[in-house]
């Protein structure tokens, strides 16, 4: 009996030693569809030992990559069922610190298509973490062929389709602590919103959605912001942006016009794939809210504005499009109680979100509104536009229950001074050499604009 115990111990000891000698390889996928490039990485990775594949979480994917067409759970199962994969784990950050420190793989296997910013940040992060214990990076030549490129193109085009884009704002509200929205007023500004990714404090980040502002749309056309640019022209701008981007769009709907007209416009926006429209509770000639009481502005009655909200909601054919009510009580100095009274009434009428606006230089009254609103209404999204109180951080907004922050006019306001300065310098110097260092190189323009 003792001999058998001895042999059993020896056998287990040998297996333990063999297990400890087996190398571990790790790779991570964020893809929604497996093509031969991924299969090649799995095949090559398997040569180095036991292969663990990380699947990037939905929350991490929206910070650094395209929005997931397939949810994490389905992507996890898809990878799990591929031959050659020994284990599948969730990767919760696009950078590898956490997963490498946890698994300590002998090798990280990746395609060689990550040498340009921002992907180069991920590569540097992997090398840094592997160097801590002598791990090795294995780069596999990326599979460039017509089939792979076609699959990538189809997945991008799928994200741009109305039925996928329209619902994405609601999905982002469930994934992100705060949805970050940047203004776009043309196809090129839409591409900037779409493609800008930064690295900060060890994380990659990007904007989640785009805001098509009536102010910026009017300014780009050289017209005043008084609803002079009609809805047909606004929709042409939307179409230009929709044509070259995939991110969800929120439209600045001004007052929404007549309730009967608003219903038809909502139906059109929903069909186009717009995610939301924000309408303000004012009537009469539209004037920019940041003028406040310096110009004549008239607030709509609660009853009439509720009827407009209801008209828009009743026109919808899906539950994906959002009608968001913008409250002007603080702008027009009608007081906090009026703002809250309106907010609760608008939610009762069917508003999918509340935007509270202020022209104060500090966020105090906005925070007071949000705190009081949240005491009673826990779920309805709150939207803010911190144009006048720009010092506030997104983390501060989250602490007060705010769900969406819109940087409403900043691409327009930064573009025009740059263009004016270029014009001045050329006139002053009678040549263009002096502006060369301040303008975009041609190769960057080419990279920004996608070809079919």
Residue ranges and their predicted role:
Residues 59-61, 115-117, 145-146, 217-219, ...:
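Short gly/pro/ser/thr-enriched loop/turn and capping motifs at secondary-structure boundaries
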Residues 6-162:
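Nucleotidyltransferase catalytic core that binds NTPs
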């Amino acid at each position: 009996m003792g001999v058998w115990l001895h042999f059993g111990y020896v056998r287990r000891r040998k297996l333990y030693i063999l297990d400890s000698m087996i190398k571990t390889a790790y790779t991570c996928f964020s893809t929604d569809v497996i093509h031969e490039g991924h299969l090649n990485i799995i095949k090559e990775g398997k040569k180095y030992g036991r292969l663990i594949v990380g699947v990037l979480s939905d929350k991490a994917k929206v910070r650094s990559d395209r929005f997931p067409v397939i949810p994490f759970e389905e992507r996890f199962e898809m990878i799990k069922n591929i031959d050659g994969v020994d284990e599948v784990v969730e990767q919760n950050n696009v950078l590898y610190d956490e997963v490498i420190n946890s698994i300590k793989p002998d090798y990280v296997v990746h395609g060689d298509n990550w040498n340009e910013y921002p992907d180069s940040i991920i590569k540097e992060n992997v090398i840094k973490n592997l160097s801590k214990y002598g791990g090795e990076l294995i780069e596999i030549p990326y599979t460039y062929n017509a089939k792979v490129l076609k699959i990538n193109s189809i997945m991008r085009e799928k994200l741009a389709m109305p039925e996928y884009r329209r619902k994405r704002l609601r999905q982002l509200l469930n994934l992100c602590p705060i949805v970050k929205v940047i203004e776009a007023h043309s196809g090129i500004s839409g591409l900037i919103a779409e493609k800008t990714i930064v690295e900060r404090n060890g994380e990659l980040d990007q904007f989640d959605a785009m805001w098509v502002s009536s102010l910026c749309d009017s300014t780009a056309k050289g017209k005043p912001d008084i609803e002079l640019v009609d809805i047909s022209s606004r929709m042409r701008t939307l179409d230009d942006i929709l044509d070259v981007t995939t991110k969800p769009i929120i439209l600045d709907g001004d007052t929404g016009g007549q309730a009967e007209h608003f219903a038809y416009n909502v139906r059109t926006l929903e069909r186009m794939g717009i995610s939301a429209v924000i309408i303000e509770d004012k009537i009469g000639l539209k004037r920019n809210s940041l003028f406040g009481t310096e110009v004549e502005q008239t607030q709509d009655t609660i009853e009439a504005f509720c009827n407009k909200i209801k008209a828009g909601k009743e026109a919808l054919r899906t539950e994906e499009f959002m009608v968001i009510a913008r409250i002007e009580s603080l702008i027009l100095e009608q007081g906090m109680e009026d703002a809250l009274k309106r907010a609760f009434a608008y939610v009762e009428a069917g508003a999918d979100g509340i935007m509270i606006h202020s022209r104060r230089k500090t966020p105090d009254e906005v925070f007071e509104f949000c705190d009081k609103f949240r005491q009673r209404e826990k779920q309805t999204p709150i939207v803010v536009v911190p144009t006048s109180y720009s010092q506030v951080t997104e983390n501060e907004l989250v602490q007060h229950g705010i769900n969406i922050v819109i940087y409403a006019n900043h691409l327009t306001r930064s573009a025009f001074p740059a263009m004016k300065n270029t014009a001045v310098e050329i006139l002053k110097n009678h040549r263009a050499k002096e502006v060369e260092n301040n303008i975009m190189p041609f190769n960057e323009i080419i990279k920004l604009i996608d070809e079919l």
